[in-house]
Design a protein with these regions (language model features):
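Conserved N-terminal substructure of TIR/SEFIR domains
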Residues: 1-61, 65, 80-84, 94-95, ...
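Short amphipathic alpha-helical segments
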Residues: 18-21, 71-74, 100-102
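Glycine-rich, Arg-bearing micro-motifs that act as flexible, cationic patches
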Residues: 68
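A short, gly/pro- and small-residue-rich
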Residues: 71-85
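Glycine-rich, charge-decorated loop segments at or immediately adjacent to ligand/cofactor-binding or catalytic sites
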Residues: 94-106
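Short acidic-hydrophobic, aromatic-tinged amphipathic segments that line or gate anion-handling sites
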Residues: 109-115
Length: 166
């Protein structure tokens, strides 16, 4: 099944991503994630490549787990190579690692960690609509009225090389 939006995420973030998928689908956004789009006995790498090829936008769910995920880094690289539009969605307040910095330079992100997920989802819907993804009219109208949760790309890159302190 072809979808307009591919979500790249780490398996450790699955519960938050499934909540996000449900919210996006309520706005009639066509979403593909690995757990729902891969049939049994198929080559999962081939399915992922086809899903990225067929999507309009890759949502990159950024978290400490995803920045360490080899598969997430590969999906981002493939989407970038295929010139797909990328919408970074930060699940936590963390810097962008060097492995993703090049592909995300200058791209605005949505912050999904502010305990105001409804408004963040509205910002995503607004962004997806601007990137050519079909959303239902009611969701589009609500998104247009919602406050923004978009951060400018260059501001989040300055912490890319920063080390975490405990």
């Amino acid at each position: 099944m072809s979808a307009e939006v591919f979500i790249s995420y780490a398996s450790e973030d699955r519960s938050r991503i499934l909540d996000l998928v449900e919210r996006l689908r309520k706005a009639d956004v066509s979403v593909w994630i690995d757990q729902m789009g891969i049939e049994g006995a198929t080559m999962w790498t081939q399915e992922i490549v086809e899903a990225i090829d067929n999507c309009k936008v890759l949502i990159l769910a950024i978290s400490p787990s995803s920045t360490e995920s080899e598969n997430v880094v590969k999906e981002l690289a493939l989407a970038s190579e295929r010139r797909k539009k990328i919408l970074p969605v930060c699940l936590e307040s963390s810097g962008i690692p060097k492995s993703m910095e090049y592909q995300l330079a200058g791209i605005q992100r949505v912050d999904y960690f502010l305990n105001q997920e409804d408004q963040a989802v509205q910002a995503m819907i607004r962004s997806l609509g601007k990137l050519g993804v079909a959303v239902n009219d009611e969701a589009s109208d609500q998104a247009a009225k919602a406050p923004g949760f978009i951060s400018h790309g260059s501001s989040h890159l300055k912490d890319a090389g920063a080390k975490k302190t405990k």
